[in-house]
Amino acid sequence: MTTFNLTIVSAENKIFEGAVKSVQATGIEGELGILAGHTPLLTAIKPGIVKFTYNDGIEEVIYVSGGFLEIQPNIVTVLADVAIRGSDLDQDRILAAKKKAEDNIVAKSGDLNHEMLTAKLSKELAKLRAYELTEKLVKNKR
């Protein structure tokens, strides 16, 4: 299968750059599956995971806090405020932050910041999904 170049950068550094055969991400209008030769596109992406597959079939997961995805026929670029490899996520920290976000939503249900609190919970759930998917991929390699 034909490969293309994928670059994932955060505000702090370049997280990944290399040849891949496919990329999956969540755009603002739904799921995106990207292969070499994809039609050019620029779209915002939601907080969640970017999953990509190397030419040998190995998959990797990166959590992104949202950002932009640019697709050219042989180059895909993800620009995110925060990007963390699934293998670098800490389950205990994620679960603690998720619990705190849930408690804040319950405690401040009538608060004007409810939308912001819900967005925080959504990000923690996306991190947890990235962590769990990475764990599953690691177990399948064994």
Swiss-Prot record:
GO CC aspect terms: plasma membrane; proton-transporting ATP synthase complex
One of the record's GO molecular function terms: proton-transporting ATP synthase activity, rotational mechanism
Subcellular location field: Cell inner membrane
Pfam families: ATP-synt_DE_N (PF02823)
Superkingdom per UniProt: Bacteria
This protein's record includes keyword Secreted: no
Job description of the protein: Produces ATP from ADP in the presence of a proton gradient across the membrane.
Protein name: ATP synthase epsilon chain
Organism: Mannheimia succiniciproducens (strain KCTC 0769BP / MBEL55E)
Taxonomic classification: Bacteria, Pseudomonadati, Pseudomonadota, Gammaproteobacteria, Pasteurellales
Gene label: atpC
